Amino acid sequence: MENIKNHPAPDQLDSFDKYPPYYGQDLELAYTPQRSVFTLWAPTASKTRLNIYSSGEGGNPEEQLEMEPSDDGTWRIAVERDLNGSFYTFQIEKEGKWLAETPGILAKAVGINGDRAAVIDWNQTNPEGWESDRAPELKMYSDIILYELHHRDFSIAPDSGIRNKGKFLALTETGTKTPEGQASGLDHLKELGVTHIHILPSFDYGTVDETRLADKTYNWGYDPKNYNVPEGSYSTDPANPVTRIREFKEMVKSLHRNGMRVVLDVVYNHTASVDRSNFNLTVPGYFYRQNADGSYSDASGCGNETASEREMVRHYIVES
């Protein structure tokens, strides 16, 4: 580990352009059964810590571990045991104050409501045949027949004939019909000759409380929370980090098998919130465009907009 004196002092980073970029592939978790290495890019933090939990919600952390700084704007710690099935958050201290916990900005698996990141065995997320799955060949752009859909809207009707209503798995069911005998769901898309499915946001967003799905809270998903994790309300078990990923993959595999390519709508230009966003809880201010008076720019019309002109924001979007 680098000595703390080599870490860029927060008070020296008076311009976003001075924040040291980090392009390593180990952000934010590198897992093996033998050890997990956590690496957080937080160049303005004075301290950071890792909180390890046994569950995705509630309770106190089983461990709180101080992370060690490096001279590239990152903080690191290695845990020398198998953490599969555990959950974790990061926290940073800035200007003498510990900010709220965050799963980080690059979490790929989370617990319910996306508040804690999860350590999982990625092999468990692969449905049978996933390794050989390929999108259907596209020969000419003029052949495209595009169909846009929202996961919940597409299958939620009581008379849709679909068992997994409002879920990723709805797009894996065949032989479904309406009471009038018309094809529904996936069979309806095939009837139309659709070649491409454009799916409204599929990734973890903030509006729907995944512990209260009976409330039928609705949103299109344009309020992103965790960009790299499938939305839990579209899973049959939002509390299980593996389930939401495996079911998302099953959906993609099913669409490919039925001759359709998948286009994913991802909302990179703004986030659901600002002050409690994972971006601002990790590197405060950096990921958002601001006006001259320090207020947040709002060209998105959603209260904030991400600063894609900054190096690590661009890098984040490309890598995500």
Regions found by a protein language model. Give the residues of each.
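Structural beta-strand segments of beta-rich domains
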Residues: Q34-F38
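Beta-strand signatures of extracellular beta-sandwich domains
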Residues: R49-N51, Q91
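Solvent-exposed serine/threonine-rich low-complexity stretches and specific carbohydrate-binding patches
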Residues: P61-S70
